[in-house]
Amino acid sequence: MKRTVAVVGGDMRQVRLAELLLNDGWLVCTWGLDQGGGPNAVPLDQALGAELLILPLPVCRGGGLTLPLTDTALGAEQLWPRLRYDQLLLGGMTKELSPRLMLDFGLTLLDYYDREEVQVANAVPTAEGAIQRAMEATEETLQNCRCLVIGYGRIGKVLAHRLRGLGTQVSVSARRYSDRAWIEAFGYEPLATDRLGAELGDFDVIFNTVPAL
């Protein structure tokens, strides 16, 4: 017997996930994806009764479930008491949530964003979205612009590669010597993040991929 999967909240990534699961033969329902055309939309109580719940990435933002595709708000404290301990719960960026949910509600929330392949795949639309914002904010093309990427994590790597493909002059800053060695090996100008200062004014566009400088 097939288990019911409920995709609850999130953005167009979750809409696409629901469609893929349907195509693979799963019994799928959705809630909170109405503005994105989420398939098989059902009332919240019905969605929360599914054996498997897939929650957004990140699960919560500002104290509530991440719900950019609906006008309905759902506070996290309204959600957790309505779930069962025997449900399989999947969500993204759950490290701060998981211990408290187990302690307070007996729930186990697994973090699909712990998987490296998910983080790398997520870096692609993030990097391309950043480039789109830069294009919209500048009056000239990015070709030949001096671009600085701060940080050489997953997003920084993809971003530098995409910018190179657009013909920009790419510099990348990182804290670790090993990262700066790789930056230079790939043909970008390496800079030390902790030494960025007056030279920031030399760049036409700056992309920051680190949480804090």
What are these regions (language model features)?
Residues 58-62, 74-86, 186-213:
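Rossmann-like adenosine-cofactor binding region
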Residues 56, 136, 157, 173-178, ...:
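Conserved mixed alpha/beta catalytic, RNA-binding, or beta-rich assembly cores of soluble enzyme
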Residues 11, 34, 93-95, 175-176:
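Residues in the short beta-alpha loop(s) of Rossmann-like NAD(P)-binding domains
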Residues 55-144:
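Glycine/serine-rich phosphate-binding loop and adjoining beta1-alpha1 elements at the start
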Residues 1-5:
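Extreme N-terminal starter segment of soluble prokaryotic enzymes
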Residues 6-16, 21, 143-164:
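Glycine-rich adenosine-cofactor-binding loop
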